[in-house]
């Protein structure tokens, strides 16, 4: 964001705190005349105020570690237990903003991990609070859609092509219901990665 501000791509910024690299902090100090007019630090009671966020019609963009087929997202825990990030004020923004967007690369670790999974290993934001999921593959607009339509959008538009057949296979295995899930296979991607080191090696027959 510091570079975007210096390039004129972001005009102003407001935040309760700054956590930047030493290099970015040096740029702020070296351009203090500019940043003193365009960067505002406010206490979290103001920056994360639901009333202020709603009144401004904020477009909330947050980062996810993984998203599942129905629009739930995990932004904090790896494989359900290892803490990677805190959620900060994201819940204040996604629930009160005009639009909530979660972004993530479709894969990690050279393709061995899919960010689109049958079921998240941990959930920070539920399907009720997520409007859009965006990866480098495209975006899924989840607004006003039922579970199966959301799943189709996410697979077709957000999942990496290497994982789309596996995700479609999971949907076929899941028993019918409002939100189809196969309890033994729901975390097969994660289990396979922990055992074999690559989610692409998932064989659902091992979980049936």
Where are these regions (language model features)?
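Conserved alpha/beta enzyme-core scaffold
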Residues: 1-208
């Amino acid at each position: 964001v510091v570079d975007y501000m210096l390039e004129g791509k972001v005009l102003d910024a407001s935040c309760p705190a700054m956590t930047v690299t030493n290099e970015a902090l040096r740029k702020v100090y070296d351009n203090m005349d500019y940043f003193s007019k365009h960067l505002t630090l406010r206490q979290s009671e103001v920056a994360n105020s639901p009333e202020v966020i709603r009144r401004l019609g904020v477009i909330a963009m947050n980062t996810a570690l993984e998203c599942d087929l129905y629009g739930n997202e995990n932004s904090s825990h790896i494989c359900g237990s290892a803490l990677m990030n805190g959620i900060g004020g994201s819940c204040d923004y996604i629930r009160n903003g005009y639009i909530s967007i979660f972004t993530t690369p479709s894969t990690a670790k050279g393709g061995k991990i899919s960010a689109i999974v049958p079921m998240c290993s941990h959930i920070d934001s539920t399907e009720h609070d997520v409007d859009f999921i965006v990866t480098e593959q495209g975006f899924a607009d989840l607004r006003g859609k039922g579970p199966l339509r959301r799943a189709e959008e996410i697979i077709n538009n957000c999942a990496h092509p290497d994982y789309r057949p596996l995700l479609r296979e999971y949907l076929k295995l899941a028993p019918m219901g409002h939100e189809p899930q196969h309890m033994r296979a729901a975390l097969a991607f994660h289990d396979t990665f922990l055992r074999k080191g690559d989610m692409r090696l998932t064989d659902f027959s091992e979980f049936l």
